C-alpha cells in the first residue's frame, strides 16, 4: 500500500494563542435612553451603593470578638475600640480639622503660584497674569554699564576664567562634578567678583543676600484671585531702590499695547487652586529692616537630572512671576492695597542660571491696577540664553595615546559676565 504525502494544515486561530472577538463589535454610540441613563438610579439603589456597611451590619448579626480575652483568637473578629483621647493635643498624631471646618476656608478659590509651578506657555502666560509688556534685550542703561570699560574689573576675563575653572575643575575630587555642586559654587564665585567692586564704589557694601525667605503677594486679574507665596530664589536687598528704567513717555505708551492671549488654554492652568488661604501681602522681612528694597533675585537650577530642572522658557516665566511678586509686595507696603498707577515705579531684577546658561531680566512695576487689560501696563526686559562658556572638559580626550583635547574651560564668553556685573552695579553707578 502506497503512503500518501502528509498535508500540513494551519492550526485554527483559537489554538495559536490568538484571541478572536466573538460576535459583532459593541456599539460605540450613546447609551440608550432609559430611566437610569436619563434620571439616574432610584434613591434606594443609590443609597445602597453609597452607604458601604459591613456585611454583619447588613444582615443584623452580632459580632463575636476577642476583646474580652485581650489576645488574638483565630476565628473571632477583631474588636473595634473608640478613638483614644489622650487629653492633650499631640501635633504628630492628632488629626487636623476638616477643610470645611478650617477658619480660613472661603467659597471663592484662589490660584497659587509657588516655586515648583511650571508655566505651560512660558513667558506669554506670565505676561498675561502680571499684565506686562515684553521688551527683548536689556535696557539701554544696563547695556551702557556693561560696555563701559570703567565699570569692569582688572583682568576681568582671566578672573572669570578662574572662577569657572574653580567651580568645574578644582572644587571637587570627583572626576566630573555634579551640577548641584558646581552651580552654587560658580554663583558664589561670580558674586565674589562683583563684591570686589565695592572698593571702587563703597555704596555696594550696603547690600545683603537673603536666602530661604518667604514672600506673599495677592492680586485680582479679571475676576480671578491670584497669589504668589512661599520660598523662591536668593534675593539681594539694598538700602536704596533702583531708579525707574523706562521714562514716563514709555510708560504712557503701554496703554496701546494689547496683551496676547492663548485661548482655549486657561491662564491659570498650571496654578494650584485652593480654598483655604489668607489674602496676605508680605515682603518676607520685618518692619525696620535696613535692607528693605529688593534689588536682584537669583535662581539656581542645579538639579542633576534634566527632568527635575526648569526648561529655559519655564525658568524665564518663573523669574518674571517672582520679580513681579517681590515688586508688588513692596508696592503695597509703600502705597497701600488700593489699585493705582505708581508715582515711583518699582524695579526688580532677576538672574537665572543652570551653571552654564544665563537668563537676565529687568522688571518695572508701573501699576497695581491689574483687574482689566486696559490702561497702563508693567514692563519687562529679557535677555535670554546667554552662555558663559561652551564646555568644560573634566577628563582629557585621548586618541591613540595622544591627548587631543586637554582638560580646561572652552569657549569662554566674557560678554555674559559683563551683563551679570552690569545688573549688580545697576542702581549704584
Curated annotation (Swiss-Prot):
Its main location: mitochondrion. GO terms for cellular component: mitochondrial large ribosomal subunit; mitochondrion. InterPro entries: mtLSU_mL37, Ribosomal_mL37/mL65. Residues 22-33 have a biased composition (Pro residues). The keyword DNA-binding does not apply. The keyword Ribosomal protein applies. Keywords: Mitochondrion, Ribonucleoprotein, Ribosomal protein, Transit peptide. Residues 12-45 are annotated as: Disordered. It comes from the Eukaryota. It is found in: Mitochondrion. GO terms for biological process: translation. Residues 1-29 form a transit peptide. GO terms for molecular function: structural constituent of ribosome. Belongs to the mitochondrion-specific ribosomal protein mL37 family. Component of the mitochondrial ribosome large subunit (39S) which comprises a 16S rRNA and about 50 distinct proteins. This is Large ribosomal subunit protein mL37. It comes from Gallus gallus. The gene is MRPL37.
